[in-house]
Amino acid sequence: MEKLIPLVHLNDRTSFLSSRLLDVLLKHNTLLHYYQSHLPFKLYFKEIYYITLNIILRSFLEFNHTYSVIISLLVSPDFLNTM
């Protein structure tokens, strides 16, 4: 199995963009918990999560070694159970 390469080994721009998107998703996760009882907000944030996840996965399509790392970080059972 190919060894996974950390995000910091990618070029600066890609690494910066990925870290910013991950920051946004972490903040979004907090907001999702806050709005959990408000159905319209819950649906809205869930949609944002999947749109952002799609953007990240498309951005890293050429980095196969990074692809699985991002999936494991963002599509964790703990996070998906909150949705």
Swiss-Prot record:
Top-rank lineage group of the source organism: Viruses
Protein's name in the database: Uncharacterized 10 kDa protein
Species the sequence originates in: Mirafiori lettuce virus (isolate Lettuce/Netherlands/LS301-O)
Lineage per the UniProt record: Viruses, Riboviria, Orthornavirae, Negarnaviricota, Haploviricotina
